[in-house]
Amino acid sequence: MASRQDRREARAEADARRAAEEIARARDERVMQAEVDARSAADEIARARADRGAATMGADTAHHAAAGGGILESVQEGAKSFVSAVGRTFGGARDTAAEKTSQTADATRDKLGEYKDYTADKARETNDSVARKTNETADATRDKLGEYKDYTADKTQETKDAVAQKASDASEATKNKLGEYKDALARKTRDAKDTTAQKATEFKDGVKATAQETRDATKDTTQTAADKARETAATHDDATDKGQGQGLLGALGNVTGAIKEKLTVSPAATQEHLGGGEERAVKERAAEKAASVYFEEKDRLTRERAAERVDKCVEKCVEGCPDATCAHRHGKM
């Protein structure tokens, strides 16, 4: 900024010098032109007076010779005096112009000095104002930064507190939800346990009922098998005595069919009880037991019938029984 001010002052000084030089040059030219004009006027006056003096000279040339020479000299002296006066006048004007030019230059220098001092003062004031404004701006900036820093710290703390509060609320809500879920799960577990126990009790009761029915059916079947075996044996004996019938195996087949009929459970009865697999297992065990009883009874009856036949054969035969089925003919006695 100072260099720009210096350049402005230098330009002002140069302009002032050029103006003073122009003024001096113009005044010198006017003075010189005035001198030339004065000399020309003096010459014209001298020629006019010379011509007028020559016209009046006539008859008395001799008388007026001395006087004429004096007039010419007088005219020449007058012209010289006029030229000197004009010279002095224009010389004074030139001196006055030079003095005025000098005064103008001095005034210009004074004005330039004053302007330079004024410019320097203004520059100092401007610098001081700029420095003051800069300091004020820096102070305001620092204040704003401090306020912003405090505001940011407050907002950060508020955000941190809000986040902590939200986290605490979320934790409490999660705990409450977990407690509710745990209670609901425990309640569901108790309900499921009670339902399972109830179903198990119902199943157990159903199995017991089915087992009891199966035992009853097995008992009935066993009794029926025994009755059928006895009836079959009696029928076989009658048929043997009469030479008719299908024999012991046919009778046993009838007994087997009766056992199957007794052990067969209708689909409606099957659907009345729980646990189809357990029921089938119980029924299978009951059927096996019934079959075992059946075959034991069969063997027992077979042995009894064989013993009875042998006894009858012994009673009827002395030397031997003609019947091919007689046991003693085969070495079984």
Swiss-Prot record:
Statement: the UniProt record of this protein carries the keyword Coiled coil: yes
UniProt key word Flavoprotein: no
Basic and acidic residues: compositionally biased ranges: 116-163, 172-219, 227-241
Coiled coil: 3-52
Recorded superkingdom: Eukaryota
Induction: In seedling leaves, by salt stress.
Cellular component per GO, a single term: cytosol
GO biological process: cold acclimation
Keywords: Coiled coil
Region described as Disordered: 1-20, 116-246
Family: Belongs to the LEA type 4 family.
Name this polypeptide is given: Late embryogenesis abundant protein 1
